[in-house]
Amino acid sequence: MLNRDHVAAPAVMLLASLHGELANRIRAVVEEWPIPPKLVGLFGSAARRDGDARSDIDVLVVTDDPALDDRVDDLAELIRRWTGNRAQVVGRTPADVARLVRAKEPIVSEWTRDLIVIVGERTALGKAA
């Protein structure tokens, strides 16, 4: 149990909430995009919370935005600046996701198993959800 009177308590509480803060920052950025994404979520070690200081942060973005590549690159850079970790932001259109689901690509299993939804709906993963 945390002694909230301890001088280090605010720092401990801040460290404990880093995962939520990252999700909040990602949400704030993508909510400013002119075309709202269908789905944005953390997956991999960032979602499972079993990564370390060297782990990358995996983010899935599903959108019809024609500027998808630029949005993904910009978000990856922001995440790197916020965390110090490399970000692997995977941008896919809904059609891409449907094709990956039909092909039973292994990454789809990881998404359905680990994904923490930040924005949108898990149903954007189609039949894999």
Model features per residue range: what roles?
Residues 1-38, 48-54, 63-129:
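Catalytic core of pol beta-like nucleotidyltransferases
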Residues 56-58:
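Acidic active-site catalytic centers that drive phospho-/nucleotidyl reactions
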Residues 44:
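Active-site glycine-centered loops adjacent to acidic/histidine catalytic or metal-binding residues
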Residues 41, 60:
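Phosphate-binding active sites in nucleotide-utilizing proteins
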